A protein has these predicted regions:
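HIT superfamily nucleotide-processing domains
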Residues: 1-121
Length: 121
């Protein structure tokens, strides 16, 4: 899999496709998933052209890496699913074919608002 600048997340970042934005800063955008799998289902993506987590960790600046990590926590707070609520959430990213990655742009799913269930079936 290689990075495709016409993937849906790249189009959202270029504002060619609308999204229901939750959070944004210089390095990260978060928005609601259009096909939620749980009561709360958000996506958190870096603004750079990163294919997956390995690509991101190898090429992103320290500032981008910290921004993405902190954004996940900030989004969980905005959505009311953060650790301090006592409920929690699952943060998930898929990597390549065997990992189930469908969109060739690094993205984290945040699932919550209800019990998430088993990790892998």
């Amino acid at each position: 899999m290689s990075y495709n600048k016409n993937n849906i997340f790249a189009k959202i970042l270029r504002k060619e496709i609308p999204c229901k934005k939750i959070f944004e800063n210089d390095h990260v955008l978060s928005f609601h998933d259009i096909n939620p799998q749980k009561k709360v289902h958000a996506l958190v993506i870096p603004k750079g052209d990163y294919l997956n987590l390995d690509d991101f960790n190898n090429r992103a600046s320290d500032k981008e890496i910290v921004a993405l990590s902190k954004a996940i926590t900030e989004v969980s707070k905005i959505l009311g699913i953060s650790f301090d609520t006592g409920k929690g959430y699952r943060a998930l990213t898929n990597l390549d074919e065997h990992g189930g990655q469908e969109v060739p742009h690094l993205h984290f799913h945040l699932f919550g608002g209800e019990k998430v269930g088993k990790m892998v079936e």
